[in-house]
Amino acid sequence: MSQPPAKRQKRAEYRKQAAEAVVAQPDESAPVAHVKLPKKKFYRQRAHANPFSDHQLNYPLSPAHMDWASHFPAFVNPDATQTNLIGTRKLLKDVEVVDIGCGFGGLLVGLAGLLPETLMVGMEIRIAVLEYLNTRIQALRVQQQQQQQKTQSHAALVPGGYQNISAIRSNTMKFFPNFFNKHQLSKIFICFPDPHFKARKHKARIISETLNAEYAYALRPGGLLYTITDVEEYHHWILRHFRDESALFERVSEEELEKDECVKVMKEATEEGKKVTRNKGNKYVAVFRRKEDPEWA
């Protein structure tokens, strides 16, 4: 009697089949459930990755070298002469929203229908997690297309049909400016980042004086930077570091946050947010608005 396949081999086979299923063009006569969403249990990975390790990453030399067309095919400029510095087609609009450390993509999926005409990208360093998210996004797109064909309707169940979200593998601490031009972004999300509790690990926190300056460069005046954590000490760390950058950011009032639908999605749609809710933990939210540049800048 043959032995059952090893768990690692089983996971690899599942992931390969899931990726192939969403790449193929959907059959018009196929039911909506023909393409299924991937299962997380087959994309296991450690909770965190060391940002200082020498990961083998692909990143553009500059924002003008970034190939966004492969991520947002529905928004590719139809004019074939409109190409970037590496010869790939430009988009009809720029990416405006970034989810740093996007994980399994709960925030992106939650925001997709809320901001259907806004291009959003998640940045994640873990390979298996990113593979899951991209397979999930492709599956959601195919499901929307199948539903349209089934109902003969031109309106997707979710506005935009998830064509406005994607994810890339990147180390934000090293390569964030390589992807985005000055004042390109309208929103940046940092949801439940690794708190790095030990003092000697604080240099690995995604909120710091140096990184905040990079976020301010990419964020347009009036743009918002959203943060949420379930660690109170880290929340105070965030407040302190943005308070020290008072020339660049100002904190958004609680009254404004209550009216912001993005805050509701950030608190309830992310996988970490759901876990904190199940465990009856606290969620500490702080949102900061990018100030106008001085006239001499």
From Swiss-Prot:
Keywords annotated in UniProt: Methyltransferase, Nucleus, RNA-binding, S-adenosyl-L-methionine, Transferase, tRNA processing, tRNA-binding
Instruction: Tell me where it resides.
Output: Nucleus
Binding-site positions, S-adenosyl-L-methionine:
G101, E124, I125, N171, T172, C191, T270, E271, E272
GO cellular component, alphabetical, reads: nucleus; tRNA methyltransferase complex
Which top-rank group of organisms is this from?
Eukaryota
Q: Where is the active site?
A: D194
* Annotated metabolic or biological route of this protein: tRNA modification; N(7)-methylguanine-tRNA biosynthesis
List the molecular function annotations (GO) for this entry.
tRNA (guanine(46)-N7)-methyltransferase activity; tRNA binding
Looking up InterPro entries in the UniProt record yields: SAM-dependent_MTases_sf, Trm8_euk, tRNA_(Gua-N-7)_MeTrfase_Trmb
| Catalysis performed (reactions) | guanosine(46) in tRNA + S-adenosyl-L-methionine = N(7)-methylguanosine(46) in tRNA + S-adenosyl-L-homocysteine
Specify where it is mainly localized. nucleus
Please name the Pfam families in this protein's record: Methyltransf_4
Recorded E.C. number(s)?
2.1.1.33
Nucleus as a keyword of this entry, yes or no, is yes
Q: Has keyword Methyltransferase?
A: yes
Q: Which family does it belong to?
A: Belongs to the class I-like SAM-binding methyltransferase superfamily. TrmB family.
**What PANTHER family does the database record attribute to this sequence?**
3-DEOXY-D-MANNO-OCTULOSONIC-ACID TRANSFERASE/TRNA GUANINE-N 7 - -METHYLTRANSFERASE, TRNA (GUANINE-N(7)-)-METHYLTRANSFERASE
Q: Which HAMAP family match?
A: tRNA_methyltr_TrmB_euk
What do we know about how this protein assembles, alone or with others?
Forms a complex with trm82.
| Function text | Catalyzes the formation of N(7)-methylguanine at position 46 (m7G46) in tRNA.
**UniProt protein name:** tRNA (guanine-N(7)-)-methyltransferase
The organism's taxonomic lineage, starting at the top: Eukaryota, Fungi, Dikarya, Ascomycota, Pezizomycotina
